Amino acid sequence: MAKKKIEAIIKLQVAAGKANPSPPIGPALGQHGVNIMGFCKEFNAKTQGMEPGMPIPVEISVYSDRSFTFEMKTPPASYLIKKAIKVKSGSSNPSKDFIGTITREQLEEIAKVKDPDLTAADIDAAVRIIAGSARSMGVKVEGVE
């Protein structure tokens, strides 16, 4: 059997357990002829055990015969940081206005969750990557240079 040819790769961010055919999912998949309800049911089934509403980046590979496969990534670092310090949004002026403080332990937890998607050599490098994301959101970082 010949290997199927990938026709398109679609990258979306979908809330866990809340995939439905409305925008942005419907139009993005529809223009490539993908079975939208098939994707929604499959995605919702795979994200059933996750926190409802958590944004999940997903990469959908569409093949020439209109079939598809998808790969779920880890939630965005900004979402995990906001969840850890219990705030709704980042600072509008991150260099001057701080919205909270995050500890090294919290950063290590986030780094362990994000590890499969990060290119860091070790957990310390991953912590520094997450710390940089936190600083750019206006979060004070404790325990990391």
From Swiss-Prot:
Domain of life assignment: Bacteria
Post-translational modification remark: One or more lysine residues are methylated.
GO MF annotation list: large ribosomal subunit rRNA binding; structural constituent of ribosome
GO CC term, one of those recorded: cytosolic large ribosomal subunit
InterPro entries referenced in this protein's UniProt entry, alphabetically: Ribosomal_uL11, Ribosomal_uL11_bac-typ, Ribosomal_uL11_C, Ribosomal_uL11_C_sf, Ribosomal_uL11_CS, Ribosomal_uL11_N, Ribosomal_uL11_N_sf
One biological process term in Gene Ontology: translation
PROSITE patterns in UniProt: RIBOSOMAL_L11
Pfam family, one: Ribosomal_L11_N
Keywords: Methylation, Ribonucleoprotein, Ribosomal protein, RNA-binding, rRNA-binding
Function: Forms part of the ribosomal stalk which helps the ribosome interact with GTP-bound translation factors.
Quaternary structure and interacting proteins, as annotated: Part of the ribosomal stalk of the 50S ribosomal subunit. Interacts with L10 and the large rRNA to form the base of the stalk. L10 forms an elongated spine to which L12 dimers bind in a sequential fashion forming a multimeric L10(L12)X complex.
Family that this chain belongs to: Belongs to the universal ribosomal protein uL11 family.
Name of the molecule in the record: Large ribosomal subunit protein uL11
Organism of this sequence: Francisella philomiragia subsp. philomiragia (strain ATCC 25017 / CCUG 19701 / FSC 153 / O#319-036)
